[in-house]
Amino acid sequence: MDARWWAVVVLATLPSLGAGGESPEAPPQSWTQLWLFRFLLNVAGYASFMVPGYLLVQYLRRKNYLETGRGLCFPLVKACVFGNEPKAPDEVLLAPRTETAESTPSWQVLKLVFCASGLQVSYLTWGILQERVMTGSYGATATSPGEHFTDSQFLVLMNRVLALVVAGLYCVLRKQPRHGAPMYRYSFASLSNVLSSWCQYEALKFVSFPTQVLAKASKVIPVMMMGKLVSRRSYEHWEYLTAGLISIGVSMFLLSSGPEPRSSPATTLSGLVLLAGYIAFDSFTSNWQDALFAYKMSSVQMMFGVNLFSCLFTVGSLLEQGALLEGARFMGRHSEFALHALLLSICSAFGQLFIFYTIGQFGAAVFTIIMTLRQAIAILLSCLLYGHTVTVVGGLGVAVVFTALLLRVYARGRKQRGKKAVPTEPPVQKV
């Protein structure tokens, strides 16, 4: 991208960097509270691990360590840098899905209800808690307004730790295909995963949750762009058409919705820049994971590898900033926050397992319909619980977005019915 474009974005964003929380007019306590400063500080922390690691990987590859290496560290270095390429084609086959003996229609309906309920409960609860944690205060009394939790990176760490534990236990308890990918390749998806999650949490300080949900729905556009750039993919005409409808619907919502109590042109700009960052990083994550599935790993193995590096990045960055203990002390001061953060992490981790199971049992089309309905319900709940305003034109924009999403499901289903079904592992979905 042209460097001048980035300069314009940064310069336009600078006036809004001090705005945040419930009072956009109030200046930040210090320049270290600016979201752009925190973002750059986080990136510097991740780079302090990733750059030396990448240089070490390139050095070992140039030195042909795979042929000359010896010693106790050799198996670890081989797994991290070179991977374990299977000797025979049979070894890379994914573990077959086992069909239950009870495959009657009533049993299928029960499984569908179970999957839909699990996805709805997990992600609706996650959405409500996310907005509560990032916009509410803790410890408020009649004489004190309480404290706001501000460290989005600490919340990302909590999510990733529990997801890592859940994925690790699943891999231990259920047989997985032989792992062949070099571990270091997960680090690229982990980095973009962490940055997208940070932008997602941070954006809630500046824009409403319904705005964020619609922004996520519109990420199909940058995903297609990244697919063109990263994977050299081609797309059908209906994909471009529905992407355009989504853009129109989101624009209708953003331009017509009433102002939020804490909003201003400055805070809105900050929120939109953060949402753009979330969409860009998340699009890269999806396409990089698609490329990694060439190693024939399972989705849970992908979940484990990405979350492993995400934990390493966030722990290292928090330690460098001295923020890890401060986040723990905030949890100690406010047990309600500790409970919310734990529930948020549980919903995120088990929601991913529901995603894998639903796609495995019913396919991506059914999963997409369930999640599209979840997004619509999430907007409704957020408006009811937190008092967000939506105008008639804004409501029509929401309807256009979800209509376009359902049209994509219908068109994709018609296209796939004309082809022979080929089982593929879905990319890891994250929140």
Curated annotation (Swiss-Prot):
Which PANTHER family does the annotation name?
ADENOSINE 3'-PHOSPHO 5'-PHOSPHOSULFATE TRANSPORTER 1, SOLUTE CARRIER FAMILY 35 MEMBER B
Q: What is its main location?
A: Golgi
Q: Name one GO cellular component term.
A: Golgi membrane
Q: Which InterPro entries match?
A: SCL35B1-4/HUT1
Membrane topology per record: Multi-pass membrane protein
Give the family per the record: Belongs to the nucleotide-sugar transporter family. SLC35B subfamily.
* Protein name as annotated: Adenosine 3'-phospho 5'-phosphosulfate transporter 1
Q: What organism does the record attribute this protein to?
A: Mus musculus
Where is this protein found? Answer: Golgi apparatus membrane
The UniProt keywords, alphabetically, are: Antiport, Golgi apparatus, Membrane, Transmembrane, Transmembrane helix, Transport
GO molecular function annotation: 3'-phosphoadenosine 5'-phosphosulfate transmembrane transporter activity; antiporter activity
Keyword Transport part of the UniProt annotation: yes
